[in-house]
């Protein structure tokens, strides 16, 4: 014990004597100029380091004061609560837009009677929106945790355009899911058909298989109808962010008449309308009511009963339905078989329509009235056109003329002597395609900046007449269908060509409006939502309603209500 104390005392004495020994050694040194400089530099450096350390310590102390001291569990709870609040706000905005999508989907299928099915679709989209919004908002907040409070968090501004884009993303995701379901179900049906040859069973098993086949076919038809409506809705959404040309503006007018969303109170919420002539909308409440009545007759029940369409689909798949030109993409059909099946049904419906004399009078009078209004808009006298038009109608009213007409049309590749094939397909749609791709000679004249408008119009008229004159020389029947048709075209084609290819004017707007209404009528009659493919009578009735509605819109737009005189028939 004494030795330990002795060692400790020696250690303390040496520690106390160490500064004295250092001081004595410094006093013995001779202060040379170099040593003084070294000591001065060392002193200054030491003082600088002390001040720098104090400054850094002060700054670190401020940060510690600003940062709230929380326990790990509380910090995780606050972060999760913050994420939940942000996720709920984002998901609520997307769900609101999704609800609007669901409400717009309900407009084509009798919103009160058919709200359950559409609510299922919108409910699935809401769940998808909530999942995606929570993930996206959680990522944003997780990135902001590592930042200090001095840095501002950049949150995207909520604008109608952003909400629109978010809704379109969700809508496209739903479309992909439906397409996958349709593809998967079709593939499964094909596999079952391939394996049906080796299946053996009793009568009960065969009956169960037949019931499953019926349910499967019904599901596929409903899914196809839903996809067709969704494609139409997607195109209408894409056109909402800008409409500068008359065709798109006519599209807006059409959507104002076709898309009327009924809310819980039953009131119509009509969207803002855009008129081609920059005037107020000419749609009336009565027209919207008629539109809703027609939609009530073409509700969701028609999606379950397509007896006429199913029979036509079997014929189309067997290759027994023929046409001159496939219009699958133009008329927004799901495929060539879908187009041919609907075409077969529409041919039967038009055959039923033409059998009634009042329908023939309506069709002839409507054509004369609208085309005469177009010529009047071009500031020309429609007298020659009306005379040629009446001569052609009188020729077609004679039963003995149809043998010649059939021979002429068969030589042009006509597959069926029907109103759709002759008027809508051969005359109307082919003419619209020709006007979209005019000859180079006409294009060069119209694009020439050194020519005035009157000279361009004269040149376009001369080009049309020369083409028609050449076609007349190639006719095999001098007084047949094409002779009368070319006589009508001599008065009408120059007006149409100048209206579509000429400068922006009231004639150009009217031509674009006519084209838009024609295309929407054609798409309407190929749409399960607008017409009923249950039987020929209902389909013919719905086609006539669509035609009358489009005609009324066009007549109101052209301001030709006073010119409703019936055609003179011999």
From Swiss-Prot:
Superkingdom of origin: Eukaryota
Any single Gene Ontology cellular-component annotation: plasma membrane
Keyword Mitochondrion attached: yes
Transmembrane regions: 34-54
Keywords, in A-Z order: Membrane, Mitochondrion, Mitochondrion outer membrane, Transmembrane, Transmembrane helix
Membrane topology qualifier: Single-pass membrane protein
Molecular function as annotated in GO: protein heterodimerization activity; protein homodimerization activity
Record-annotated disulphide pairs: none
BP terms from Gene Ontology: mitochondrial fusion
Pfam families, per the entry: Miga
Compartment annotation: Mitochondrion outer membrane
Subunit structure, interactors included: Homodimer and heterodimer; forms heterodimers with miga2.
Family: Belongs to the mitoguardin family.
UniProt function note: Regulator of mitochondrial fusion: acts by forming homo- and heterodimers at the mitochondrial outer membrane and facilitating the formation of pld6/MitoPLD dimers. May act by regulating phospholipid metabolism via pld6/MitoPLD.
Listed name of the protein: Mitoguardin 1
Organism name: Xenopus laevis
Gene that produces this protein: miga1
């Amino acid at each position: 014990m004494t030795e330990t104390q002795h060692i400790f005392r020696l250690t303390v004495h040496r520690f106390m004597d160490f500064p004295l020994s250092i001081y004595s050694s410094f006093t013995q040194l001779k202060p040379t100029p170099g040593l003084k400089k070294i000591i001065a530099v060392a002193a200054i450096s030491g003082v600088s380091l002390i001040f720098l350390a104090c400054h850094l310590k002060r700054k670190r102390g401020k940060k510690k004061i600003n940062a709230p001291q929380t326990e790990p569990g509380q910090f995780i709870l606050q972060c999760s609560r913050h994420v939940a609040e942000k996720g709920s706000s984002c998901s609520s905005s997307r769900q609101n837009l999704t609800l609007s999508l669901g409400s717009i989907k309900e407009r084509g299928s009798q919103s009160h009677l058919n709200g359950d099915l559409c609510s299922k679709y919108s409910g699935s989209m809401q769940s998808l929106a909530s999942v995606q919004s929570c993930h996206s908002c959680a990522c944003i907040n997780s990135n902001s945790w590592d930042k200090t409070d001095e840095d501002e968090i950049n949150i995207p501004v909520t604008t109608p355009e952003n909400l629109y884009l978010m809704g379109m993303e969700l809508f496209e995701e739903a479309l992909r899911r439906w397409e996958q379901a349709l593809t998967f179900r079709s593939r499964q049906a094909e596999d079952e058909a391939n394996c049906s040859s080796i299946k053996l069973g009793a009568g009960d098993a065969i009956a169960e298989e037949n019931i499953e086949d019926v349910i499967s076919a019904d599901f596929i038809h409903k899914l196809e109808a839903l996809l067709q409506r969704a494609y139409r809705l997607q195109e209408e959404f894409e056109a909402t962010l800008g409409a500068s040309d008359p065709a798109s503006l006519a599209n807006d007018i059409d959507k104002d008449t076709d898309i009327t969303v009924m809310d819980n109170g039953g009131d119509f919420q009509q969207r803002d309308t855009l008129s081609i002539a920059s005037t107020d909308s000419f749609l009336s409440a009565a027209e919207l009511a008629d539109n809703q009545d027609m939609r009530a007759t073409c509700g969701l029940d028609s999606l379950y009963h397509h007896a006429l369409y199913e029979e036509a689909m079997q014929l189309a798949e067997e290759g027994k339905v023929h046409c001159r030109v496939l219009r699958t993409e133009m008329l927004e059909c799901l495929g060539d078989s879908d187009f041919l099946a609907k075409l077969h049904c529409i041919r039967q419906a038009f055959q039923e329509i033409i059998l009634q004399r009042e329908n023939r009078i309506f069709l002839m009078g409507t054509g004369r009235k609208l085309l005469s209004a177009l010529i009047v808009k071009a500031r020309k006298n429609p007298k020659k056109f009306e005379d040629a038009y009446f001569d052609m109608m009188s020729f077609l009213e004679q039963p003995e003329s149809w043998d010649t007409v059939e021979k002429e049309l068969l030589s042009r590749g006509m597959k069926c002597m029907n109103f759709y094939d002759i008027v809508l397909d051969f005359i109307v749609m082919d003419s619209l395609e020709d006007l979209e791709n005019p000859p180079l000679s006409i294009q060069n004249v119209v694009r020439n900046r050194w020519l005035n408008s009157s000279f361009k119009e004269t040149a376009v008229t001369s080009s049309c007449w020369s083409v028609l004159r050449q076609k007349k020389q190639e006719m095999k029947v001098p007084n047949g269908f094409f002779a009368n048709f070319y006589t009508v075209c001599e008065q009408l084609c120059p007006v149409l060509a100048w209206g579509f290819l000429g400068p922006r004017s009231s004639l150009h707007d009217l031509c674009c409006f006519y084209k838009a209404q024609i295309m929407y009528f054609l798409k309407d009659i190929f749409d399960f939502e607008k017409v009923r493919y249950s039987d020929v009578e209902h389909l013919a009735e719905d086609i006539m309603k669509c035609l009358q509605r489009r005609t009324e819109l066009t007549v109101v737009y052209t301001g030709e209500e006073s010119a409703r005189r019936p055609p003179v028939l011999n």
